[in-house]
């Protein structure tokens, strides 16, 4: 299953997160008509969220196709002011020094540009040994401030049961799904857990228990501090 399908399919492990993330990211993406740079792009699951981008550049340390630029997020092989928008989805916590990533992003950003950051506050351990920490919204603010960036908007996504769905699905994916004969049961368990947890989250939203967040950063002199602590809405 591709990474995007994990967000879109009810049988995907990130379906509940996707119900909040995809509408919010698509709304932001439609406003970008210039050059979008996707760092640590992987399978480029969010490319379709930027339908009007004039150019969609992708960088990854281990490219999956020939169009992806090979490079480290801390030293991207592109000239200064290459992008109008930079996308960082669950990326900056995969390096031991996130400030180095944001400093490089600041170099790549054109005047009037913005940085879109998606991070999870409770995602299970992944990509070991390159999974260093979970960066809370205030942590992102603090790191961004050191390189001249400011959080312009921060949307908290999901809630307590989004967290539960993430852990439940990780257990199923790492347990039943390893055995071919049990995969149908595992997939049904994932789907049932997704629907149940999403319904509970919608009935009892609690922003302080949000599982993820989507933030927009801009150079400090161009940013307004418009933090939005309310939980993001899904379809």
Where are these regions (language model features)?
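S-adenosyl-L-methionine-dependent methyltransferase catalytic module, highlighting the catalytic core
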Residues: 99-100, 104, 114-235
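Short catalytic micro-motifs in class I SAM-dependent methyltransferases
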Residues: 90-94
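Conserved N-terminal segment of class I S-adenosyl-L-methionine
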Residues: 1-80, 85-89, 210-213, 220-235
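Helix-to-beta-strand junctions that scaffold the AdoMet/dcAdoMet cofactor pocket
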Residues: 95-96, 109-111
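Glycine/Thr-rich phosphate-binding loops of Rossmann-like dinucleotide-binding domains
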Residues: 46-47, 96, 125
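GHKL-family ATP-binding catalytic core of two-component histidine kinases
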Residues: 77-79, 96, 136
């Amino acid at each position: 299953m591709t990474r995007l399908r994990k967000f879109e399919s009810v049988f995907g492990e990130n379906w509940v997160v996707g119900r909040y993330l995809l509408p919010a990211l698509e709304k932001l993406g439609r406003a970008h008509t210039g050059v979008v740079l996707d760092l640590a792009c992987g399978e480029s699951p969010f490319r379709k969220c930027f339908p009007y981008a004039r150019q969609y550049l992708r960088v990854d340390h281990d490219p999956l196709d020939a169009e992806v630029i090979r490079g480290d997020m801390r030293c991207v092989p592109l000239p200064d002011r290459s992008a109008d928008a930079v996308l960082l989805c669950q990326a900056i916590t995969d390096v031991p020094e996130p400030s180095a990533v944001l400093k490089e992003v600041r170099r790549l950003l054109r005047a009037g540009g913005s940085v879109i950051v998606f991070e999870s506050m409770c995602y299970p351990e992944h990509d070991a040994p390159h999974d260093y920490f979970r960066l809370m919204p205030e942590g992102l603010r603090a790191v961004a401030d050191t390189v001249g960036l400011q959080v312009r908007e921060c949307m908290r996504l999901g809630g307590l049961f989004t967290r539960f769905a993430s852990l439940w699905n990780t257990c199923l994916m790492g347990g039943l799904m390893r055995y071919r004969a049990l995969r149908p049961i595992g997939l049904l368990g994932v789907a049932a857990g997704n629907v149940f947890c999403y319904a509970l989250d919608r009935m009892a939203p609690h922003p302080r228990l949000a599982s993820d967040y989507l933030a927009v950063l801009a150079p400090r002199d161009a940013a307004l501090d418009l933090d939005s602590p309310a939980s993001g809405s899904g379809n």
